[in-house]
Amino acid sequence: MTAGERYPVVVTVGTDHHPFPRLVGWVHRWAAAHPDVRVLLQLGTTEAPEPLASVHAVDLLPHQDLVAAMAEADVVIAQGGPGGIMDARSVGRQPIAVPRRGDLGEHVDDHQVRFTAWMAQRGLVHLATDEAALLLELDAGLADPARLRIPPDGGAIDDTITAFRAVVEPLLAARRRNR
């Protein structure tokens, strides 16, 4: 990825060692039918599909590069783990989440199926459990990118830092006084 490149669609399969060919295949078929839309596709351990001019496929990206691409994207599609979902939300993008399935060898079990259903019930992700749902969400997101924009969500990080500071700062102040 070159600095300054913008991809309207960013897809991440995460860093799990299991391949995720189902999601990669769905996105690849969509991209082949939409050659005018640039896609950044982070593959992880999934085998790269046939190259398309509109798709920049990479095994892994440095975390800061992936998050920066998410911030510039109209649509972020993430596997159903908390890392990619929270990264997208942290930069103001409500992701389309596609859970990995244990019965397909995409993960050890179906915890992503349960997790993404829980997130979707609370309006925190758009859930796509099959190709038709993914394409519907993807097309709707490109037609109206505002529907996938949210205020940047730092999650509990800010609260955790505040609580940490409340405990540590008095300890440091006491230590300084006792020197």
Q: What does each model-found stretch correspond to?
A:
Residues 23, 112-115, 146-150:
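Class I S-adenosyl-L-methionine-dependent methyltransferase catalytic core
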